[in-house]
Each structure stands twice: as C-alpha cells, then as structure tokens.
C-alpha cells in the first residue's frame, strides 16, 4: 500500500532551507509514529510531498488514521501506483478503478502531472472524462460540485490512481517550534489550548496543580496521555504534578476573600515558571479566555503575568465557550472534560474583577513562600509514556451514605468562610468542622474510633478527600450525601 502525504500550505511558502528542515522533521515524526504499526514501513521525503509505503495490509486503516493526526500534514492520498504507456492506458486503468464508484453519479476528472509528456493535464482530463462518460451509461459529467471527483496524478511513467483523500489536521510538524509547558486541569479549555500548540509545532509538556487527591490526578493524567498519544506521540514529553493543597490552604487562611482567585493564579504561574526554567521550556500555555471568569479580565491577567518573566501563551483568549466545547468535541476531549470534577471551597464568594496591584502584593506579604518552594521541589515528574500503565491502577472506592449510625460523625470539610456563611446542622448526629486543606495534617488527630462522614456542598471535594484518606490508610471514612 502507498500513501502520498501533502504538506500544510504554510510549509510550502517557507524559504528553501526552512522548508527542507520542516519536511525533514515531519518525515522523522511520521517514522516515529508509524513504526509501532509496521517496522518495515518506508518513509521517503520529496520536495513537495512525503511518500509512505507499507507491506502489512492489515495495518492499512490504522496507518491512515494515524497519519490524519500528525501535525504538519494537510491531507493524505491513498494511491495505487502503476506504470502506464499512453493516455488510453491511463483511461483503461481509471475505468477499472472507478467504474463502480461512478455508476449513477455525476463526476469530473482532475489531473496533476509532473515530468515530460506529449500531453497536458487538461488533455488527460478531457480524454479520461470523455471515455468514462461513454463507457458508464449511468454516469454524467458535471464540472461544478460533482458527486465524485476522479483524482489522478501522473509522474514520469507512473500513474497514481487515488483511491481516497483524507484530511489531516494541518499546522506545523512538532519540533519545528520550541517546547512549551501547558497548565492542564483536565477541563475543556486546557485540553484545547494544549492541542492548538501541538498543532502549531510545539512539543507540549504538562503541568498539573493537584487540588483534590489521586482521583483528580488520574483523570488529568488520562487527558494528557490521550492528547499526547493522539496528536504528539512522535516526541517524549513530561507530565509534572504539583500538590497544591498546602498552597490553597495558606491562601484560604492568609488572603482576603476577594483577592484569592488572582493570588492563586499568580502562585500557579510562579510555580509553573520554576518548572519551565528547570527543564529549559520557553513558554507557558493556559486555557484562559477573556472575561470567562473573574480572574480572566485584562486587569487581572496583567497582574498574573507580572509575577514571571516567562512568556504566557493564551491561544483561546478570544474564543467563546461554545467554540471551545466544539473544538474539544472534535479532538475527543469533551467526555473527559464533562466528567472532570470542579471544587467547592477553592473559589472566592465575591472575587474582584479589577484587582489592584498594591493590594494583591500586600495580601501576598502574608503568604509563606517557603510552602510554594517546597511543593515545587517535591513535584512529581514522569515520562508521559509511563502514564498508560499508571492510570490503569484502580482508585479505592469510598462508600457514599445518605443516613448515619450511632458511631458516625459528619465532617464538614468546606472552607471556614463557607462554614460561617451556611453552618451545617443535622439533627441526631454530631457535626465537626475541618477545612479540606487541613485534612492531610489534622485528620489523624480526630477520634479514630468514630466513622467520619465527609461532606461538602457539591460532593466532589468530599469524595476526593475521602479517597485520599483511604490511600493514607484511614478506613473509617465515608461520603455523606443526604
């Protein structure tokens, strides 16, 4: 079998040296991706296309599908490569190939020709088109918007009968631009923004700020691995996970409610910049869109950018949510994003949309930056290729209950402000307050002879924190959902 890879048009308008470099990199990327399907596969680069030849017919569909997801490819032609003698021979071969496909349809013939011949491309189109029209009674020529377009390519003494054309994702080959670090949360925005930078030729590494235990991290790892495996598997990348619960806890205790969102984002950018510097990455990527939430106003984005010299790229800055969700659906991350948890207790009740620099800096003076340094130092860095095995581990299930027994105590894990605003009172059972960000250090001090029923507003944080406690060896935890 044979495939002809057509280059993304922006590659073809580059200078000769740049174009050759891009084609060379794309050829290497194709080899890296396809070697898993057929080790005997041949990839040959030319000035205006790349040729892929494979022997294992059983892998035809898999190879074709993989090619449509490699950045830098405009479209793929699946072809049958045969010799020919003259125009009539071209017609006979086209008739044998396309007869069934053209019956009862309108059609036109389009020919591309390279090399020296006694005929022009238009002459071949007329000759073959006329012959097909005469020999297939139910077919009819229609030059504008036909049902079927018969594509032929003539190169020297070879005829390429095009059996199918398949669109690629375009863009630049990965590796033609410098590395970036994507701040990935597993939601719609960060997945799409990561894809957009891969499509633009960047090797995308991933940085995840864990706010909710193993279950959330496993979910985000699956998203990152999916994106890499589907669009960027030609290159090795890193997945860096930072336990940000201590930072969130410090913010909730030390920072004014209205400033929390901007301060949290500033802390994330500081941490990600340290990771980027450690690995020689040139830019950060976020999924922020202008005005989508309170921290994404121009004033707040400028204050967030100010904490780091690292370039921050925001490919979705002008996109609306519907457009982002449509893109997520196209690339296959929509289902991941819809099931990714959101966290109660991490969001300000009355966030500022126009933060003042002096006020933000004053709030941050109360923050213990050694906590930030520590979580960055302890960040977990893995090769994304290892995630496939790691994410197969089963997360321990935690029982969810709607009632309670004599030995049960409800543990309200909301933030202090939320507890003050809406105190939880349940008749017939004790309620103890312990904010979620203190569970890792304070839960062991509680009476372990009791069964603790974790509760929060949405039920997401309580489940994730219960999973975390179970992982730490505490079997006396359940989730309370009345």
Swiss-Prot record:
Coiled coil: none annotated. The active site is at 456 (cysteine persulfide intermediate). It catalyses: [ThiI sulfur-carrier protein]-S-sulfanyl-L-cysteine + a uridine in tRNA + 2 reduced [2Fe-2S]-[ferredoxin] + ATP + H(+) = [ThiI sulfur-carrier protein]-L-cysteine + a 4-thiouridine in tRNA + 2 oxidized [2Fe-2S]-[ferredoxin] + AMP + diphosphate; [ThiS sulfur-carrier protein]-C-terminal Gly-Gly-AMP + S-sulfanyl-L-cysteinyl-[cysteine desulfurase] + AH2 = [ThiS sulfur-carrier protein]-C-terminal-Gly-aminoethanethioate + L-cysteinyl-[cysteine desulfurase] + A + AMP + 2 H(+). GO terms for biological process: thiamine biosynthetic process; thiamine diphosphate biosynthetic process; thiazole biosynthetic process; tRNA 4-thiouridine biosynthesis. It is found in: Cytoplasm. Its EC number is 2.8.1.4. ATP binds at residues 183-184, 265, 287, 296. Catalyzes the ATP-dependent transfer of a sulfur to tRNA to produce 4-thiouridine in position 8 of tRNAs, which functions as a near-UV photosensor. Also catalyzes the transfer of sulfur to the sulfur carrier protein ThiS, forming ThiS-thiocarboxylate. This is a step in the synthesis of thiazole, in the thiamine biosynthesis pathway. The sulfur is donated as persulfide by IscS. Disulfide bonds join 344-456. GO terms for cellular component: cytosol. Keywords: ATP-binding, Cytoplasm, Disulfide bond, Nucleotide-binding, Redox-active center, RNA-binding, Thiamine biosynthesis, Transferase, tRNA-binding. Gene3D superfamilies: 3.30.2130.30, HUPs (3.40.50.620), Rhodanese-like domain (3.40.250.10). Residues 61-165 form the THUMP domain. CDD domains: PPase_ThiI (cd01712), RHOD (cd00158), THUMP_ThiI (cd11716). Pfam families: ThiI, ThiI_fer, THUMP. This is tRNA sulfurtransferase. Residues 404-482 form the Rhodanese domain. Belongs to the ThiI family. InterPro entries: Rhodanese-like_dom, Rhodanese-like_dom_sf, Rossmann-like_a/b/a_fold, ThiI_AANH, ThiI_fer, ThiI_N, THII_Thiazole_biosynth_dom, THUMP_dom. It comes from Salmonella schwarzengrund (strain CVM19633). One of its GO terms (molecular function) is CCA tRNA nucleotidyltransferase activity. Pathway: Cofactor biosynthesis; thiamine diphosphate biosynthesis. PANTHER family: TRNA SULFURTRANSFERASE.
């Amino acid at each position: 079998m044979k495939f002809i890879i057509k280059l993304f048009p922006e590659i073809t308008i580059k200078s000769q040296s740049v174009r050759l470099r891009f084609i060379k990199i794309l050829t290497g990327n194709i080899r890296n991706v396809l070697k898993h399907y057929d080790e005997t596969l041949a990839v040959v680069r030319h000035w205006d296309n790349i040729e892929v030849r494979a022997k294992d017919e059983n892998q035809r569909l898999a190879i074709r599908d993989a090619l449509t997801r490699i950045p830098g490819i405009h479209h793929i032609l699946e072809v049958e490569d045969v010799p020919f003698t003259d125009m009539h021979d071209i017609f006979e071969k086209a008739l044998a190939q396309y007869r069934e496909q053209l019956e009862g349809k309108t059609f036109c013939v389009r020919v591309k020709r390279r090399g020296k011949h006694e005929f022009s491309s238009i002459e071949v189109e007329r000759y073959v088109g006329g012959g097909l029209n005469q020999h297939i009674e139910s077919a009819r020529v229609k030059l504008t918007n036909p049902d079927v377009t018969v594509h032929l390519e003539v190169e020297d003494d070879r005829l390429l009968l095009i059996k199918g054309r398949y669109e690629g994702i375009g863009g630049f080959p990965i590796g033609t631009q410098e590395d970036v670090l994507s701040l990935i949360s597993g939601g719609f925005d960060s997945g799409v923004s990561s894809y957009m930078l891969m499509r633009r030729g960047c090797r995308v590494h991933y940085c995840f700020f864990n706010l909710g235990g193993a279950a959330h991290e496993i979910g985000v790892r699956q998203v990152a691995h999916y994106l890499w495996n589907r669009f960027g598997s030609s290159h090795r990348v890193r997945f860096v996970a930072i336990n940000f619960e201590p930072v969130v806890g410090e913010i909730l205790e030390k920072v004014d409610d209205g400033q929390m969102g901007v301060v949290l984002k500033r802390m994330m950018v500081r941490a990600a910049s340290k990771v980027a510097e450690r690995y020689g990455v040139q830019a950060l990527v976020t999924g922020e869109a202008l005005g989508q939430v309170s921290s994404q106003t121009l004033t707040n984005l400028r204050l967030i950018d100010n904490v780091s010299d690292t370039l921050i790229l925001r490919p979705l800055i002008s996109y609306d949510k519907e457009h982002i969700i449509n893109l997520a659906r196209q690339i296959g991350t929509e289902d991941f994003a819809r099931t990714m948890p959101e966290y109660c207790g991490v969001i300000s009740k009355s966030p500022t949309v126009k933060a003042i620099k002096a006020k933000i800096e004053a709030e941050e003076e109360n923050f213990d930056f050694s906590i930030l340094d520590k979580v960055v130092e302890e960040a977990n860095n893995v090769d994304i290729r290892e995630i496939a095995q790691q994410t197969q581990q089963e997360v321990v299930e935690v029982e969810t209950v709607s009632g309670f027994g004599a030995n049960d105590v409800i543990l309200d894990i909301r933030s202090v402000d939320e507890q003050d605003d809406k105190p939880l009172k349940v008749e017939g059972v004790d309620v103890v307050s312990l904010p979620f960000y203190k569970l890792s250090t304070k839960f062991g001090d509680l009476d372990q002879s009791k069964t603790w029923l974790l509760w929060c507003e949405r039920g997401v944080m309580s489940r994730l924190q219960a999973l975390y406690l179970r992982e730490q060896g505490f079997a006396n935890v359940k989730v309370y959902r009345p």
